[in-house]
Amino acid sequence: MAKWLNKYFSLGNSKTKSPPQPPRPDYREQRRRGERREQPPQAVPQACSASSASCGSAAACFSASSGSLPDDSGSTSDLIRAYRAQKERDFEDPYNGPGSSLRKLRAMCRLDYCGGGGGGDPGGGQRAFTAAAGAAGCCCAAAGAGAAASSSSSSGSPHLYRSSSERRPTTPAEVRYISPKHRLIKVESASAAGDPPGGVCSGGRTWSPTTCGGKKLLNKCSAEETGAGQKDKVTIADDYSDPFDAKSDLKSKAGKGESAGYMEPYEAQRIMTEFQRQESVRSQHKGIQLYDTPYEPEGQSVDSDSESTVSLRLRESKLPQDDDRPADEYDQPWEWNRVTIPALAAQFNGNEKRQSSPSPSRDRRRQLRAPGGGFKPIKHGSPEFCGILGERVDPTIPLEKQIWYHGAISRSDAENLLRLCKECSYLVRNSQTSKHDYSLSLKSNQGFMHMKLAKTKEKYVLGQNSPPFDSVPEVIHYYTTRKLPIKGAEHLSLLYPVAVRTL
């Protein structure tokens, strides 16, 4: 038994194994088709004449030229033959297959050539086909190129079905080009247009291709409010005209009175340009400058001194309360960039003196302003520049009466006082290392800084690079508007004094 299995399945011996052989092709189908082509085509016209007696020699010529599917018989079953026939229809050649447009066109040319000389048609060989009667007019419209070719095989088996390309009725050669239904032309309706004899349309507004006198028309049902149904015609010039090539004369006759709520972009731009030009001309006629008198109401010209006094009073009352600039500086309001600095320290006794004296911000602005009315370009590194002005210090007041002088306090006490204050807050105290020197304690973004105010030859110097001053209040007053000459504090100034807290 083992020997028989080994010999039968060729187990363990690769030399006796034969390579797999490809399946032998079945040429019986090709032989049947060859025999079918050699047979004379007399049976096909008879079948066509049995279905329709009015076809004549044209249908016989068409059926003989297009051929038919083979009628398989014998060992092949009806189901297999139906499957093969349907497979040929599904995978047919788009150019040379039985349902292709090129083959239909050739069949129509053969029909026209075969039936042109006969006298069967009363019109001398010219047949009028319409889009609605193309499928039921004559036998040539009912028998398409692919349908006539497969008439014998489809009638013999109940499993054969027509493909989608063969279900459509073919269009004869005499019918003009019919565009698809989704490509339509909007025809402008005119009130003076009459009813064409092509047909009557009812309802709202419809689009339908019709034929009238051998010419293709596009009809649109006008609105019912105009009375009877009116249709406008657009004639296609030749066989190959598309709907967008058709030109309507009614479009040029229609006036501009109709407004559909749509405007071309060019027209909209032109209207906007015209509107802007009118607005600019209107503003030029007014002649009002925006920034001459920003807080004055529009009124008539001043005629008397009393009216001028009233207007001046009104103008002063409308000025901002926290603005200390004079009224003549309102010619350039975009230069208003002053920052209001809140005083964190307690007010000292010289409030009346500070109010009577001119504001340092005003003096600073007038110094920076050029004679021509503009601002001088000042660099950030120059000593004249200061982004934020510190609180004013009166250098004439002695050191012991200044609010930022705390006397003999330690470094830790000074840091505790500066801890809750903002950056650039400062105070002055006695130095712990020298009896005649003082220390300036400053809060920066990195912590606390303690700088020495040393006394040399009756002069006071801050650090090593500052100029000499006669008193400590002069040093503090000088660096409220300038940057400190201390390494690590080049960007800082003395802005916020820390006042002495009295219990």
From Swiss-Prot:
Q: What is the recorded post-translational modification?
A: Phosphorylated upon PDGFRA, PDGFRB, TCR, IL2 receptor, FGFR1 or VEGFR2 activation.
Induction cue: Up-regulated by okadaic acid and genistein.
GO terms under cellular component:
cytoplasmic ribonucleoprotein granule; cytosol; nucleoplasm; plasma membrane
Q: Region (Disordered) spans which residues?
A: 1-49, 61-81, 147-180, 225-262, 292-333, 345-381
**In which compartments does the protein localize?**
Cytoplasm; Cell membrane
Q: Residue spans with biased composition (Low complexity)?
A: 147-157
Q: How does it assemble?
A: Interacts with phosphorylated 'Tyr-720' of the ligand-activated receptor PDGFRA via its SH2 domain. Interacts with the ligand-activated receptors PDGFRB, FGFR1, KDR/VEGFR2, IL2RB and IL2RG. Interacts with EPS8 and V-SRC. Interacts with GRB2 and GRAP. Interacts with CD3Z. Interacts with tyrosine-phosphorylated LAT upon T-cell antigen receptor activation. Interacts with PLCG1. Interacts with ZAP70, LCP2/SLP-76, VAV1 and GRAP2. Interacts with JAK1 and JAK3. Interacts with PTK2/FAK1. Interacts with CRK/CrKII. Interacts with IRS2. Interacts with PTPN11.
Q: Mind telling me what this protein is named?
A: SH2 domain-containing adapter protein B
Q: What is the lineage of its organism?
A: Eukaryota, Metazoa, Chordata, Craniata, Vertebrata
Its gene name is Shb
